C-alpha cells in the first residue's frame, strides 16, 4: 500500500486521479496545500476527506517571517474545520534561505492553533499523529 499525493495538480485533475486510485486499491490519499496552487475550495476539502483523503497545509503559509505567508490564522481555522482535526496534517515546507527553520515553523503554528482554541491533543494530531497514521506507523 502506498500514499498517493496529489502534488500540485489542479483540483479538477485530483478528482479523477483519486477516483482511479481508489478503484485500484489505493486507500492512502493526500492532498497538498489545497487552497494554494491547487484551487480547491473549502467544500472541495470536505469532499476530498469524504473520499478518505488527508489534507496537508504548509506551515510556511501561516507563520510570521515566512516569505510564503499568504493566509491569516482565521483562514487556517476554516481549513482545519473543513477537513476536521482527524484528517488535517500541518507540514512545514520551511527551512529555505531567508525563511524560518522548520522548528520555528512548528512553534509558530502550534501557537496559532492554541490561540485559535485547539486543545493540546488536537494539535498533536495535526502536527504528528495524523501523518503517522497516514504512513502506517
What are these regions (language model features)?
Residues 85-102:
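Short acidic/histidine-rich active-site segments
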Residues 43, 69-76, 104-108:
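Charged helix-capping and loop-helix junction motifs
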Amino acid at each position: 500500500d502506498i500514499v498517493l499525493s496529489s502534488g500540485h495538480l489542479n483540483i479538477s485533475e485530483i478528482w479523477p486521479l483519486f477516483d482511479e486510485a481508489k478503484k485500484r486499491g489505493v486507500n492512502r490519499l493526500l492532498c497538498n496545500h489545497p487552497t494554494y496552487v491547487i484551487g480547491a475550495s473549502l467544500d472541495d476539502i470536505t469532499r476530498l476527506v469524504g473520499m478518505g483523503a488527508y489534507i496537508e497545509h504548509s506551515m510556511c503559509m501561516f507563520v510570521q517571517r515566512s516569505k510564503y505567508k499568504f493566509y491569516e490564522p482565521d483562514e487556517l481555522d476554516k481549513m482545519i474545520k473543513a477537513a476536521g482535526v482527524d484528517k488535517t496534517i500541518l507540514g512545514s515546507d520551511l527551512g529555505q534561505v531567508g525563511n524560518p527553520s522548520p522548528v520555528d515553523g512548528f512553534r509558530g503554528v502550534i501557537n496559532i492553533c492554541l490561540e485559535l482554541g485547539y486543545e493540546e491533543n488536537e494539535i498533536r494530531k495535526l502536527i504528528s499523529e495524523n501523518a503517522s497514521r497516514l504512513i502506517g506507523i
